[in-house]
Amino acid sequence: MNKIQHKSQFWAISSEGMNKVISSSFPAEMKEAIASVDAQGDDKKEVLRDMLSVYMTQRQRMTNDEGIAEVHLHGPMLSDASPIDLAMGSTSYEEIREDIESANMDDDVKAILLRVNTPGGTVSGIEETYEAIKSSNKPVFAYNEGYATSAGYYLIAPAESIAASPSSMTGNIGTVLDMWDFSGMYENMGAKRTLMTNEGADLKGTMRTEPTDSQREFLQNQLNDMGDQFHARVVESRPDVDEEVYRAGWYQPDAAAALGLIDFKGTLKDYKSMIKSAIDIRTQ
């Protein structure tokens, strides 16, 4: 299921349902173009992505600005994001890793700048992306353009330095699981759901109804394990961060700097000038 935004509405929708949304929402020439696509698999994804980009804003891929490779972490970050997800402004973990790899292979690149404006992302895919950033053979810097929260901060923690826009928010270190119990709604509709599992598989169905005590304990342990890993990565990268940040608050730049989450507050232009000066010193 894909959670997407189109105009002023939100949907939780299947791929088949999304095809109907596209069919009813886009101009006739767009519908005809989509119907005419005869490519399959990844080729078809690329064609559809290009078409959708005419109507929607996609994440910008890596660019090289005078030796600084700019890698964008914008919108919700997902593993194996669909063309619709990407067309709606999400970021694919796979694309981030590809951009980091490309920057490391480019002799004209002297440093990597992560430009961040993301509320976070899925746990799946985050560790591989963190390792790609941490193991970069070129220095990595990070700039928070608006939000560097949750998974967004997880990924920029290993940067050599982190700067933030004066109007940005940083932090929200922790993991969350959001569950909805629709049983009451279905009962009002006259429908009652019965869930059966094989004996001993009592943790099945934990995401669809009010969890039992054992199911809740299992889910809490999963969250704690993921939260502990997040905590460990921040400590590993920025050992002087104040323990207060692990309550998952998010902070404006002055508070974020005082807590050790960022190093500088300023404009992107000033931060890039500082990076270029640092590169010049290292290459002399």
Give residue ranges: language-model regions.
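N-terminal organellar transit peptides
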Residues: 1-284
